[in-house]
């Protein structure tokens, strides 16, 4: 259970990306909750506007998926042609 007001972090790494007609059509990001434990993966289909959590990182709960949701929000706000290779995302619960 997370306490309110505590700063949390999600580390992300671009695992792969697929191009179609010189544009990034899809990407897979690995993410790690609070820089600890096993990595999870999230698939982004930019052409169809869909995302899918392939598997949750350690410390990300099945019910809230707070870390995965923050990663999805962050990636969707980026220019799909300039996706970050690695980033540390900090957020407050």
Regions inferred by a protein language model and the residue ranges of each:
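Short stretches within intrinsically disordered, low-complexity N-terminal or propeptide regions
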Residues: 12, 27-29, 70, 92
